[in-house]
Amino acid sequence: MQQDKVNLLGLNQKAIEDFFISIGEKKFHARQVFKWIHKKGVIDFDAMTDLGKNLRHKLKEKAQITIPKVVFSKASKDGTHKWLIDVGGSAVETVFIPEEGRGTLCVSSQVGCTLNCSFCSTGKQGFNRNLSAAEVIAQLWIAARTLSKTDGEHDFTVTNIVMMGMGEPLMNFENVVPAMDIMMDDLAYGLSRRKVTLSTSGVVPRIYDLLEQSGVSLAVSLHAPNDMLRNEIVPINKKYNIDELLEACKLYAQKGPHKHITFEYTLMEEVNDNLSDAEELVALLKSREVPAKINLIPFNPYPGTPYKKPSNNRIHRFKEFLQHNGFVTTVRKTRGDDIDAACGQLAGDVMDKTNRKQRYLKKLGDTNAN
């Protein structure tokens, strides 16, 4: 029985070294291949010119470097890029957002999501499966290859990663952490821990694990100033409440790379955007002594949602109150609306479990027909 070939794409440096030792080869050859894949973007063993012929032949027998297919990609007039990537009959989306002096890649970790936050379009798809480490890092590999040129107006260079795409990354810990290891490896993409941010809805035990095993920057999707409201819109709060979450955040801020936690707060009209909500949020964060920056995200409506985007006046009032009380506060700019890439639209068409594959196959067929 033929043994399945190992996909080297998702192996971090230690794992690829272990693989090479298992096939009777030396560690330094593993580092050579690792660098070819991620630093140089080469996935053909025969093109790895510093490897001997016998080693290249052995690798072709025992290993492969498999990149998922891009079903389609779109570029917005504001420079935002979005890719729909085939992951074995389903699809995930990856978004690149260029800004002055930086380029941020938003990476997905699951097909769908397990957490079912009431306002999130991805949650309406239901949950299919976790992505493999190879499927996670492939999103950066694809983006880095695609964005290696400049169009004269935008500088398309990935300088920052945010694990804020489809899915809850801490529910796919075993695959996300090795992928982030590759992102931060100097032989690969060389990003610092400060430049890789994982966003979680509050899987508290895994926050402690993340601090111990990775220590990347942490963002927390808070969205509510009290347990009653958060139980309703972020259901995982029923398992790990705000007190438990903020206790973990306080420790992470003490030992993590930024010495603060970024709290994301999606503003929904007459749900959590009242001045009383802002007052409660300030009191909460001050009483728990969590060093915090706050990123306000105006809700982006999608078909079938009951929630609405607040007026600019309400958004400004909320922001001003937080700033007046000493919190560094930003309002996320809406980007990529013309390609459905803005935050809250990562699911594109809202797909549930029953029609996700049919719509995916239709898009694949339409793409192949063009």
Swiss-Prot record:
State the SMART domains in the record.
Elp3
Q: What class of enzyme is it?
A: transferase
> Which residues of the sequence carry a binding annotation for S-adenosyl-L-methionine?
G167, E168, S199, S221, L222, H223, N300
- Keyword S-adenosyl-L-methionine assigned to the entry: answer is yes
MF GO annotations: 4 iron, 4 sulfur cluster binding; metal ion binding; rRNA (adenine(2503)-C2-)-methyltransferase activity; rRNA binding; tRNA (adenine(37)-C2)-methyltransferase activity; tRNA binding
**Annotated catalytic residues:** E93, C343
Q: Which cystines does this chain contain?
A: C106-C343
Q: Which InterPro entries match?
A: Aldolase_TIM, Elp3/MiaA/NifB-like_rSAM, Methyltransferase_A, RlmN_N, RNA_MTrfase_RlmN, rRNA_lsu_MTrfase_RlmN/Cfr, rSAM
GO terms under cellular component = cytoplasm
Q: Which UniProt keywords apply?
A: 4Fe-4S, Cytoplasm, Disulfide bond, Iron, Iron-sulfur, Metal-binding, Methyltransferase, rRNA processing, S-adenosyl-L-methionine, Transferase, tRNA processing
Q: Which SUPFAM superfamilies match?
A: Radical SAM enzymes
What the entry lists under NCBIfam families is as follows: rRNA_mod_RlmN
Q: What is this protein called?
A: Dual-specificity RNA methyltransferase RlmN
Q: What is the lineage of its organism?
A: Bacteria, Pseudomonadati, Pseudomonadota, Gammaproteobacteria, Thiotrichales
The coding gene here is rlmN
